[in-house]
Amino acid sequence: IEGDYSYRTLPASVLNIMRRYIPALILPDKKPIETENNFHFDMHIYNTELLSTVFQIPVKVYTHSTIKGYFNDKAQRLRVEGYFPRLRYENKFIESGMFLCENPGDQFHTRLRFSNRKSSGAVNIALEAQAQNNSIQTTLNWGNSSTVTYSGKLAAVAHFIREQKEANESKRKLPPLKTVIDVQPTNVILNDTLWDIHPSQVVLDSGKVYVNDFYFSHKDRHLRINGIVSPHPEDTVRLDLKEINIGYVFDIADLGVNFKGEATGPAFASGVLENPVMSTDLFIRNLGLNEGLLGDANIHGEWHHDVKGIYLDARSEE
């Protein structure tokens, strides 16, 4: 490390730079800290035993890794670039890890890429985000290398807004943060099947989450979500399913229970963030459990918050 730097003021320097791009999200300090960091660095990592033993950070680096870049408070510029060919975090093995943070122009740009190695194969992850004008555009790509394909792309733009709702409102009172997330149209592959994610919008405002027509489909099959997620019992979110394979959920969650079947029908949830009340009435075609076929079934389900359990009333036809 060469140059002028202070560990005490470095976090404030980073926030000062990022505030230029998303000022509605990162507010100024009540007591501004003077920062004069101007340095560059080139670090080579061979052994991380100190992190594990002294700081209790469960990281082990297996090969030569590097972190390099520069920081200039006066020019309001930074760049941090890291390469980690092979490491372990807790029980997760990471290969070909790379991250980059920089602001060469009118955007703050972040990129992260790695492979999560598992016994059944590897999952490749690539995340990219650009911040500018109180907005963050994020793209996530992933893909696996096992016999059954799970891969795809998620993309969204988050807009951060703080505005005075009333003309006579005190200027000293901080306006609440409102976040508008525009979900972009993309595709994902689940169990070798191509699904479409359609444009939709999610709004976070005053402690509530408004979901406006989230729509996920493959031909005639679909999942649609509308409603309000909040702590209040009068706010309800509705899910409409048509021939959705419930096996997707159990495959991804890896719960050790193998349910199969195609679900059609509505599901409702209210007061989700505090005392959730949930109910569903589904018709499941070819319901199966742990490789055994139970037949078609009509299922009424309820979440009982007092006992934190699920009540199911299922009637099946073989």
What are these regions (language model features)?
Residues 1-318:
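Interface amphipathic segments
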